[in-house]
């Protein structure tokens, strides 16, 4: 056998589906096998993939022991003369594999071959070619000098910026996303080092290949797409921890003496600096807008109070103690109302601000009405303060949108801003797929790729840039059939317009894409839309969990007599309060539903241990619960199963 393709999968079944379609095409005419090692995915990968790809050999692990170990599992069963280690979130050109194999025939000294990679938006991924880490390269990267001098042989050495991305080069490090190696080389140097859990294994293997006297090459002729659909996001603290831990391990393994000591010190420093920036950035993303809103709301109340006492109620003296307490409390209530109304969900819509302000007004006026007469100040200040808050928050958001600091979502615009590059048959399949996925109608029309342009098409792909401008297109779905993978990749690499690109293999059941290398990819699939997956419902579910837990704690003298085993009941209360459990959840542990915490009682209103229905019926109960979820659903089931809350 000439080639073995080894792919490690973890919870990216839709990306892997598209990847396998492209790999199968790239392997046509080659004596090849495809091996997929699944690291205990929980997204239903087995049921989804195994029937769809009977020619692929699957290895299903019962635990996730890391990327390196999974690759070694596949390698142990591989029969090919050459081994291609490939990430599941990639799409290959039809000639990628053939061209790489030809390169090895022409370069007997080659020990490994990487390839030019672009992200879903068509941008070159710099990790396609790298140098080995060293104190100086790390310092230049950390200090930002590599960004200031991206083509410098000295400052940009980490990503070898001085080497053209469009030419073949001898390099140090190849990316594990696409790494082709002769099996005889692996037999000589050994397999992946399993001490590297998720990152660094490609650096270590590249180092050992070079140390054995072989050369590592970067191949620019047949670019591939790498979506970055992995579960550990680059912007997370977990990514920082895993990445720099891997670099630390690499240095300790391969470097010696004072050089190693300096480098390890630099890595430790980098961990703290990067973690600090990451934590600060994540914190600002989460609380930045609410904090600014709090300032605007508080300011609005004080402005209205000053105007009110100056022009409306000149003779009224408002107690500073009341105002210093009331205004911050009312601001907090406003923010809570805004949060649970979805104002801080991804993709801002003005309707969210209107709804949030209206709900906040109702809550504030209700709270104000319950206050004793002695501590009330003025309903007018409250009402006009809310109105001014709305105006200022709206102005701030419009400014942020114009400065591109705030992502906006306009459903009316999105409905007609997607075009599909496909033949008529595939276009019908894609529109049906989007309909089944429960997405709003947003397809503007079809773009032709044939010799002639039919009357039903908006235009020809040769005029794609003009079509993007004419129809203000925000998203393009490329279908592999009327276009080859190579044509699709070349098309997105050559498109300068800022659009979202998505990809669909003819006959597949999903559409995948990613806007940038820093974001995990997204997908459209013919799956049910679950209410329980919506951010607003997840917040409401957590609110019910916490509210009931607090009620049970406050009502301790009563509830202690209403439960058969009060100690176990209150153990559940505190676990729910801590976020380790939820009052109501699924009756089945293995399903393809949105994840929620371990439940006290299940969707049948019984504890999991007491469910006697067949597994199929329990799964159906869970699907109904997830699909039709509302806050009332949980309350009804808790009332029904109240006597079992001690389980």
Where are these regions (language model features)?
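Short, acidic, metal-binding catalytic loop of nucleotide-sugar glycosyltransferases
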Residues: 21-31
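Glycine-rich, basic loop-to-helix element that forms the pyrophosphate-binding segment
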Residues: 60-78, 99, 462
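Short aromatic/hydrophobic "clamp" motif used to bind/position activated sugar donors
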Residues: 83
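Conserved donor NDP-sugar-binding/catalytic core segment of glycosyltransferases
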Residues: 91-127
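Short, flexible, basic/aromatic active-site loop/helix in glycosyltransferases
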Residues: 115, 132-171, 528-538, 546-549
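Active-site-adjacent helix/loop segment of glycosyltransferases
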Residues: 207-280
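N-terminal hydrophobic signal-anchor/signal peptide
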Residues: 271-310, 336, 343-350, 356, ...
């Amino acid at each position: 056998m000439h080639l073995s393709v080894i792919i490690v999968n973890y919870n990216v079944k839709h990306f892997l589906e598209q990847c396998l379609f492209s790999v199968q095409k790239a392997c046509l005419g080659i004596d090849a096998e495809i091996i997929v090692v699944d690291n205990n995915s929980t997204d239903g990968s087995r049921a989804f993939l195994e029937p769809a790809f009977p020619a692929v050999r699957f290895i299903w692990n019962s635990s996730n022991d890391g990327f390196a170990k999974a690759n070694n599992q596949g390698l142990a069963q591989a029969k090919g003369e050459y081994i291609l280690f490939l990430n599941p979130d990639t799409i290959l050109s039809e000639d990628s594999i053939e061209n790489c194999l030809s390169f090895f025939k022409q370069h007997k000294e080659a020990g490994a071959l990487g390839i030019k990679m672009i992200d879903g938006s068509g941008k070159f991924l710099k990790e396609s070619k790298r140098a080995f880490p060293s104190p100086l390269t790390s310092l230049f990267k950390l200090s930002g000098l590599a960004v200031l001098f991206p083509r410098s042989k000295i400052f940009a050495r980490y990503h070898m910026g001085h080497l053209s991305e469009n030419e073949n080069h001898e390099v140090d490090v190849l990316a594990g996303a696409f790494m082709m190696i002769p099996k005889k080389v692996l037999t000589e140097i050994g397999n992946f080092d399993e001490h590297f859990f998720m990152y660094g294994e490609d650096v270590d293997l590249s180092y050992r290949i070079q140390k054995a006297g072989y050369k590592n090459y970067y191949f620019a002729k047949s670019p591939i797409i790498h979506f970055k659909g992995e579960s550990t996001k680059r912007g997370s603290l977990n990514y920082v921890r895993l990445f720099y831990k891997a670099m630390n391990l690499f240095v300790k393994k391969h470097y010696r003496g004072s050089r190693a000591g300096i480098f390890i010190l630099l890595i430790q420093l980098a961990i703290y600096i990067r973690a600090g920036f990451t934590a600060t950035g994540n914190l600002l993303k989460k609380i930045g807008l609410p904090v600014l809103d709090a300032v605007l709301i508080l300011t609005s109340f004080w402005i209205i109070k000053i105007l009110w006492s100056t022009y409306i109620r000149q003779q009224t003296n408002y107690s500073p103690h009341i105002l210093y307490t009331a205004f911050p409390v009312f601001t907090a209530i406003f923010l809570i109302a805004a949060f649970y109304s979805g104002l801080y969900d991804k993709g801002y819509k003005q309707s969210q601000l209107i709804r949030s302000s209206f709900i906040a007004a109702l809550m504030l006026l209700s709270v104000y009405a319950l206050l004793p007469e002695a501590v009330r100040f003025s309903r007018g200040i409250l009402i006009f303060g809310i109105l001014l808050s709305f105006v200022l928050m709206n102005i701030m958001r419009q400014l942020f949108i114009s400065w591109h600091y705030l992502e906006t979502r306009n459903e009316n615009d999105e409905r007609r801003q997607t075009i599909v590059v496909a033949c008529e048959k595939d276009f019908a399949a894609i529109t049906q797929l989007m309909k089944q996925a429960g997405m709003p109608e947003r397809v503007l029309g079809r773009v032709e790729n044939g010799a002639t342009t039919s009357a039903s098409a908006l235009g020809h792909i040769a005029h794609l840039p003009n079509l993007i401008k004419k129809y203000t297109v925000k998203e393009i779905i490329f279908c592999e059939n009327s276009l080859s993978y190579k044509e699709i990749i070349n098309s997105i690499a050559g498109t300068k317009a800022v659009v979202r690109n998505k990809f669909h293999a003819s006959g597949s059941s999903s559409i995948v894409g990613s806007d940038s290398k820093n974001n995990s990819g997204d997908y459209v699939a013919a799956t049910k839309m679950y209410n329980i997956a919506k951010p607003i419902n997840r917040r409401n579910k957590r609110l019910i969990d916490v509210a009931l837990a607090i009620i049970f704690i406050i009502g301790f003298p009563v509830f202690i007599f209403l439960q058969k085993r009060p100690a176990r009941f209150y153990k559940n209360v505190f676990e729910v309060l801590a976020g380790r459990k939820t009052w109501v959840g699924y009756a089945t542990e293995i399903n393809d539903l949105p994840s929620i915490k371990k439940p006290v009682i299940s969707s049948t209103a019984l504890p999991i241990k007491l469910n006697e229905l067949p597994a199929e019926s329990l799964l159906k109960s869970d699907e109904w619960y997830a699909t039709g979820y509302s806050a009332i659903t949980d309350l009804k089931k808790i009332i029904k199963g109240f006597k079992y809350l001690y389980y």
